[in-house]
Amino acid sequence: MKRGQQQKTKNLVMITATLSMFATGITPSLEVFAEEQAQQKKVSTTLQNENSVNVENRVFAVPGKGDVSQLQNIERRERNFSAYEPTGLYAKPNEQITIQVQGNQSIQAYIGTFSFDASWREDSKIKSFTLNPGTNTIQSPNGGMIYFYNKQQGGTIQTTVITGGTATPLFELGKHTKQDLINMLNQYPNAHAVELKGERVLITASPVRVKKYLIDSNTDPVQLLKKWMRLLEFKIKYLDYLKNK
């Protein structure tokens, strides 16, 4: 395959969103009289409880994705698939994260997100760890989102984050709706990042960008992920065509 063709057929699977598609206005905050504030707070708390979405998960069945480097070589891709399996948990700088791995196989853990916390040339900012069966403690001076990677071909490894980590919005295709994402953003307005996960697509962006360029622009995250997945499928088919040509 020619270099130019390779460049045109890059297979993006992990997309760190810079989302700059739409412009939006600003919704002004409401002012209330002093005598109404107590009642307003009570109503707000009630609505928040009704609209809350349980996004915090600490037990994960980490799927085996195989060796992504081997897959890259077999399919002649310039950039390999993302091995990241998001947890929706954020590790603060130097925060100790205790993780329990069941079974007799090790997995990898990462703290930090490429092209979000660091560019592709700043690998040192993204910390990787080998998690052996049993209890493991990890930490990163930079902090970042926590991810797992199971190199096994198929199967799952149960992994539990026992202590550490802060919940952040994690939108999953087939599990959540646009309203769920809105509720997540309301629950965690100061989250380190927001992640949108499709079958083979992972988008990472700041809450401000997600709200501005998705929610306020009336873009459905479900349709956004489906479009990226269709684009990915097209690129894979095109790569197969070029490989067999």
Predicted regions: what they are:
Residues R3, A34, Q152, P207-R209:
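Short, flexible loop/turn elements at secondary-structure junctions
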Residues F22-K42:
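Sec-dependent signal peptide cleavage junction
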Residues L89, I138, L185-Y188, A193-L196, ...:
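A general structural signal for short secondary-structure junctions and capping/turn motifs
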Residues L12-F22:
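Hydrophobic alpha-helical targeting segments used for export or membrane insertion
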Residues R3-M14:
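Bacterial N-terminal signal peptides that target proteins for export
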Residues I162-E195:
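Low-complexity, Pro/Ser/Thr- and charge-rich linker/hinge segments at domain boundaries
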Residues H192-K245:
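Catalytic cores of extracellular degradative/oxidative enzymes
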Residues Q37-K175:
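Beta-strand-enriched, solvent-exposed domains that form extended recognition/catalytic surfaces
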